[in-house]
Amino acid sequence: LPPGRPASDDGGVPTATLTTGIDCCYEQHGDPADPTIVLVHGLGSQLLAWPPGFCDLLVGEGFHVLRFDNRDSGLSTCLPDGTAYTLSDMAADAVALLDHLGTADAHFVGMSLGGMIVQTVAAEHPDRCRSMVSMASNTGNSDFGRPGGEVIEAMMAEAPDDPAARTEKEVADNRLWCSTAWYDEGYIRALYAAYTERALQPSGAFERLWGAVVASGN
């Protein structure tokens, strides 16, 4: 792949009010008449996690690309403290976004938490899912395999409120779970700086998102 670059919404990224009650920030690439690929990001990420260069490659292969901010992420609705939801609710958001756009079905690609969401779409909304790719993710089955203790500890550590300190934490965390074959600290640093400039995720959002994983089980 060519070098990626973090994107900027430039104030022009649309927001859809979904039937699930979420205001969902999304971005489209390519021709909506082409088959759609929905890209679903992971915990602590935003739609910027999918580089424009990657989206451009998919468009070049004849796909319409849809990337969006999950609930409690980026510029989508940040829910009140104490709100509980599940992966099923998050999968329903993705399907409701298709409804909003008048898209009958799509290929779903998810990373980490996004991988769990697309698994749920495939299981609960099979008529809307043409195919599913779940990357760097889990099924919720404790026998399936789990990250190492150091990785789990880093994932569960609360992110600092200070944007610069939060970026440093993310750079260090990514060293734990990114492949050394392609790890690019400069890109990771720029990406997380773009996250914090665009929308700093409140700490309570992490607990709600992680709670969705725990509540959903296997």
What are the functions of these language-model segments?
Residues 149-218:
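Alpha/beta-hydrolase
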Residues 123, 130-161, 205:
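Flexible "cap/lid" loop of the alpha/beta hydrolase fold
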Residues 2, 8-10:
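Short, positively charged and aromatic/hydrophobic N-terminal segments
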Residues 108-110, 135:
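Short beta-strand immediately N-terminal to the catalytic nucleophile in serine-hydrolase-like folds
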Residues 110, 114, 118:
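Gly/Ala-rich beta-loop-alpha elbow adjacent to hydrolase catalytic centers
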Residues 18-80:
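Conserved HGGG/HGGXW glycine-rich cap/lid loop of the alpha/beta-hydrolase fold
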Residues 79-91:
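Catalytic nucleophile-loop/oxyanion-hole region of alpha/beta-hydrolase
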Residues 88-106:
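Conserved acidic catalytic loop of the alpha/beta-hydrolase fold
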